[in-house]
């Protein structure tokens, strides 16, 4: 079965026609139906009137014709359904504004940001190409009062503190999981338009008034408490009046001028005294408050402070004892050098001979130096005296001679160069003489 529909417009006349072809086994029949012409002003349901076939053999196609007629009737009814009229442009875009506001509020709540009107204004305007106003939010509440909870608040916008509205979702709204806010708002908007056909615009619901920026309860209460405290602590300013005895003179103008000048001087002096007393009282209060704050310490804080103080005292005492011990050792070495100055000069000469014998060596064992010193003719010291003399030299001249332990062996190291120049014998003897002279002068 094949259906074909033809439409043509000629002189405001609509022509509708179709033909049905039935394919049978080995034969082809063509059924033609009559077509009625109607004016374009008539409804679409009357555009074509289908008549039943005159041939009785074509009775098989009657159900198909009935179904086609029913479809045409239902389509005409759908097109002729009356929709609620649009009242205003704000009503036309109110659904779009609601969707944009809902998206922005969800975004800001997801990132833990307070969705305020000043924050949503630019974003919603960018999404809808419409400038968002407070009246739009009030109209949304008129259509759906439970859609948002709008409360006044303070916020920082562009570096300034401003009063605005905060948007949030009501806590007591029990909505199912698969609930779409945009669909619900559209349904409520259509319902409102059907119920209020006579109104030309959606009325705006009254919102709470914005708080004033000048009213700050915290600062105001603290300021009141401060003023009451100053009134209670400050003394009353009393300006004493000095009574002057009248002078029995004929010049009354002179007497009046003197009286006025005296009263002005007295008032200025009393005012200056009161101001000074007030300043002293404030300084006394500040010092007493500092003392009270310093006294308010717990037992744990006091114990910690005491232990830290004791630690500092112990460290200072240990440092002083170590310094005294070092000074005593140095004095002992210097005393010994002063008594045995000649023998130490001979020992330095023997060491320089040892260094010249081994020009590439800087370190020697203690036994090696002691044996070389005993083999010399100019030295008549025992091994213990030689070892003690070398130890005293290492303490007196640490920049030239040092003693280190390598296991159980004492190793004596001599520095041949100081500051890029060779260490000379005369330089060492001069240092010894200066130390000995300083010790002798200090003892005398």
Curated annotation (Swiss-Prot):
Listed GO biological process terms: cell division; DNA replication checkpoint signaling; DNA replication preinitiation complex assembly; mitotic cell cycle; mitotic DNA replication initiation; mitotic pre-replicative complex assembly; regulation of DNA-templated DNA replication initiation
Record Gene3D superfamilies: DNA replication factor Cdt1, C-terminal WH domain (1.10.10.1420)
UniProt keywords, alphabetically: Cell cycle, Cell division, Mitosis, Nucleus, Ubl conjugation
UniProt keyword Nucleus present: yes
A cellular component term, taken from the record's GO annotations: nucleus
Gene Ontology molecular functions: DNA binding; DNA polymerase binding
Segments forming a coiled coil: none
InterPro entries: Cdt1, Cdt1_C, Cdt1_C_WH_dom_sf, CDT1_Gemini-bd-like, WH_DNA-bd_sf
Pfam families, per the entry: CDT1, CDT1_C
Subcellular location: Nucleus
PANTHER family hit by this protein: DNA REPLICATION FACTOR CDT1
Entry similarity comment: Belongs to the Cdt1 family.
Oligomer and partners: Interacts with cdc18.
Protein name (database record): Cell division cycle protein cdt1
Source organism (scientific name): Schizosaccharomyces pombe (strain 972 / ATCC 24843) (Fission yeast)
